[in-house]
């Protein structure tokens, strides 16, 4: 199989499910250019009015925000309160069964205290988490399929339970990662009584902007703590909540030839933070690496051995694009 990469950002082409490219340029890069044609100020004014017009007088909360200890959650809440007149959002945090990072704990605590907000920590049934995660890992190498559905579902369920008409989520993944050419405002699960809004379709999403906004209110990165010196990563400020969760992202490398390093490095190219060559070197050096602490935490949480983990990885390895190196690590054929 010929391995192709985007002419603009260097991302591997043709392996991400549902992704598209045109003339050797990934749709994520093309969508970056499409953002210039969106009237963001108009969308922001629309949102302020939409929130005002759709308040439930019988509810103490104007909206629900699905949150974590990450930068995007801080930015969404900050802008809702400071730019859109929201007084009292209800924050909903869905937990997994992995070990939380000190940074994630600190950031979520800081977010709640900064604006004096209500927070619901939703712990999904732990035995079901283990059962479903094991099943999806062994059968599909898609370990967190079940809990990721909960991360989207629980804020909506909470909103419906309390009669709250609006739910906010972060970026529009289909647009940002090159599956759709349209920057839709509403999530497909929106209905007549509850609207789910992608905040990244109201304010143009970028890692740099989100980080700057979050740091202005005290956001802390993994490097501010000593509990997790993460490997196989392009940064210390994205996906920082829990350690074992990173395996969900890393397994994409085994199936599709990319993981979080490619996603972040190529996004940095689109944002002007890195050159294509710098991103390519970062991908070559780090995209294949499975963080050892994440692997250990994942195996502990779902009660499997590291040998079982390795055997399952080998079973699903995409040998069209990957080959094992001399040390037994799966690597992209074009980068070894």
Roles of regions detected by a PLM:
Residues 64-72:
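Short, glycine-rich nucleotide/cofactor-binding loops
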Residues 71-76, 150:
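Short glycine/serine/threonine-rich phosphate/pyrophosphate-binding segments
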């Amino acid at each position: 199989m010929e391995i192709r990469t985007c002419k603009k950002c260097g991302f591997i082409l043709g392996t991400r499910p549902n992704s598209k490219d045109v003339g050797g340029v990934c749709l994520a890069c093309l969508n970056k250019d499409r953002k210039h044609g969106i009237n963001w100020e108009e969308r922001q004014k629309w949102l302020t009015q939409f929130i005002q017009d759709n308040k439930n007088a019988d509810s103490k909360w104007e909206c629900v925000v699905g949150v974590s200890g990450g930068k995007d959650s801080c930015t969404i809440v900050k802008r809702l309160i400071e730019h859109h007149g929201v007084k009292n959002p209800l924050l909903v945090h869905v937990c997994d069964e992995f070990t939380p990072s000190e940074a994630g704990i600190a950031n979520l605590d800081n977010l709640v205290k900064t604006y004096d907000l209500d927070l619901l920590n939703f712990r999904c049934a732990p035995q079901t988490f283990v059962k479903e995660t094991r099943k999806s890992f062994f059968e599909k190498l898609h370990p967190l399929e079940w809990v990721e559905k909960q991360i989207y579902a629980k804020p909506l369920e909470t909103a419906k339970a309390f009669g709250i008409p609006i739910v906010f989520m972060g970026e529009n993944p289909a647009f940002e990662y090159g599956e759709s050419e349209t920057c839709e405002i509403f999530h497909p699960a929106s209905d007549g009584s509850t609207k789910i809004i992608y905040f990244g379709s109201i304010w143009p999403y970028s890692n740099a902007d989100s980080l700057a906004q979050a740091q202005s209110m005290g956001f802390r990165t993994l490097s501010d703590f000593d509990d997790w010196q993460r490997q196989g990563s392009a940064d210390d400020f994205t996906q920082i909540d829990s350690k074992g969760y990173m395996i969900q992202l890393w397994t994409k490398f085994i199936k599709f030839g990319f993981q979080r390093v490619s996603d972040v490095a190529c996004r940095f190219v689109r944002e002007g933070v890195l050159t294509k060559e710098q991103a390519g070197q970062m991908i070559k050096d780090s995209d294949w690496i499975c963080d050892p602490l994440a692997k250990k935490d994942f195996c502990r949480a779902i009660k499997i051995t590291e040998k079982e983990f390795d055997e399952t990885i080998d079973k699903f390895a995409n040998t069209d694009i990957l080959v094992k190196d001399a040390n037994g690590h799966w690597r992209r054929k074009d980068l070894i």
